Regions:
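A conserved mid-protein helix/loop that constitutes part of the nucleotide-sugar donor-binding site
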Residues: 17-25, 205, 209-228, 248, ...
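Nucleotide-activated donor-binding/catalytic signature segment of Leloir-type glycosyltransferases, i.e.
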Residues: 59, 250-270
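Glycosyltransferase donor-sugar binding loop
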Residues: 40-46, 210, 235-251, 266
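Short acidic/histidine- and often glycine-rich active-site loop of Leloir-type glycosyltransferases
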Residues: 52, 311-322, 326-327
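Short hydrophobic beta-strand element within catalytic cores of glycosyltransferases
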Residues: 306-309
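Donor nucleotide-sugar binding/catalytic pocket of nucleotide-sugar-dependent glycosyltransferases
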Residues: 60-63, 155-193
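Conserved acidic donor-binding segment of nucleotide-sugar-dependent glycosyltransferases
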Residues: 321-322, 326-334, 342-348, 362
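Short His-centered aromatic/hydrophobic patch
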Residues: 109-115, 133
Length: 394
């Protein structure tokens, strides 16, 4: 039995953290549990701690004084980033002691911050380190210099990687570093499909955008595109919350929706958007930069929505445009307006896309990803036991 400890720097319910919850739950509830025993360590408290525990996953919070919010990608100078990295190293030393005490066989880092901490911890515990990459390591997100350094860091300290899409994997430029792709899928075996409300006439449509309210998710682009649509929907739901320091963007969106006279309801964060998706005619994913994967796209397909999503990025691996949904270029307001017009006005097209989308969603079963991850981690532990220095190369 391989004991795998997953590490996260935050316990806030964002995309990567929810994906990890689904993955570990799938491991525990499938045949993968016969070869892999997962546990979770957070370096701060938050809602995900109880969410993990509720699924029967061994979960702990490492006591420390470091505030992960003090180190941000955007708006931070190099001196502040260096100070933050130093703090992460200190937390990593404590993490190593805890991991060694718990007898973990492999450490899985779920973010760049977690990678820095886990590099120290894995070294101290003398176990392999796997980088679970949920973000594209690209200039558009991290900046060119920092993206380059993160790639180098990953190759130096990680024995292998798990990427959440081909798009994410390509941004790593992993070279000879071993790795696998494990999509952040959905639980098709433990949760039944929900019934979807029949697609409505054009003037009665309901549109939803699901995702954290942050600028790169493009909710402002969506509102402007919708304002130019020939037929306005009956109702629009913006589903998603904000993290520390992001509240002003929600205010901007509320003001914009009011200015454009759009029928928008802001729901805030929802642990499970299924009820809204079940009554939504059109789900719009509108990120303005390449999305690493886009879990909500698969959720919308499964729910029976007609989906519009942006490319490049993970959604282009999920949707064949015109078959399972429609793809538009990220940040292109004109293309998004045209796609909205096409779907709002063509109810039959919405029905066809929604039916094909439900079938397509089944290709992203989290049980399959659990098997992929279980086999990969077992292989990496076996490699390390025979070649202790494997993976420590650029």
């Amino acid at each position: 039995m391989i004991r795998a400890t997953f590490v996260a720097h935050t316990a806030a319910p964002s995309g990567a953290e929810l994906a990890t919850l689904r993955l570990l739950s799938a491991i525990r509830n499938s045949s993968t549990r016969l070869i892999l025993e997962p546990s979770m360590v957070y370096t701060e408290d938050g809602p995900m701690v109880n969410a993990m525990k509720s699924q029967g996953i061994s979960t702990s919070v490492l006591a420390n004084t470091f505030d992960s919010r003090s180190v941000t990608i955007r708006g931070s100078g190099w001196l502040r980033r260096l100070a933050g990295a130093t703090s992460l190293v200190r937390v990593g030393w404590s993490l190593g002691a805890a991991v060694r005490e718990h007898g973990a066989d492999v450490l899985v880092a779920g973010s760049t911050k977690a990678l820095i901490m886990s590099a120290v911890a894995a070294k101290r515990a003398r176990i392999p380190l796997i980088w679970h990459v949920h973000d594209r390591i690209s200039a558009e997100y991290f900046g060119a210099a920092l993206a380059f350094l993160i790639r180098i860091l990953g190759k130096l300290v990680a024995d292998g990687y798990i990427a959440n899409s081909r798009s994410t994997e390509s941004s790593l430029r992993p070279g000879r570093l071993p790795g696998v792709i494990a999509y952040p899928g959905l639980d098709f075996r433990g949760t039944p499909d929900t019934e979807h409300t029949p697609q409505r006439p054009a003037s009665e449509t309901i549109i939803a955008v699901v995702g954290r309210l942050i600028q790169w998710k493009g909710q402002d682009v969506f509102l402007r595109a919708l304002a130019n649509a020939k037929v306005r929907p009956q109702r629009v739901y913006l589903v998603g919350g904000t993290f520390f320091g992001e509240e002003p963007f929600r205010t901007e969106l509320e003001d914009l929706a009011s200015e454009l006279q759009l029928p928008v309801t802001f729901t805030g964060h929802l642990d499970d958007p299924t009820d809204i998706l079940s009554i939504t005619d059109i789900l719009v994913h509108c990120s303005v930069i390449a999305e690493p994967f886009g879990q909500v796209v698969v959720e919308g397909l499964r729910a029976g929505c007609a989906v519009i999503a942006t490319q490049p990025g993970g959604p282009a691996e999920t949707i064949e445009s015109g078959v399972h949904g429609l793809l538009v270029q990220a940040g292109d307001t004109g293309q998004l307006t045209a796609a909205l017009d096409r779907l709002i006005e063509d109810r039959d097209l919405r029905i066809r896309l929604a039916q094909a989308g439900r079938d397509r969603a089944r290709r992203f079963d989290i049980a399959d990803s659990a098997q992929t991850v279980g086999a990969f981690l077992s292989d990496m532990v076996a490699r390390r036991s025979t070649t202790p220095l494997a993976g420590r190369r650029v």
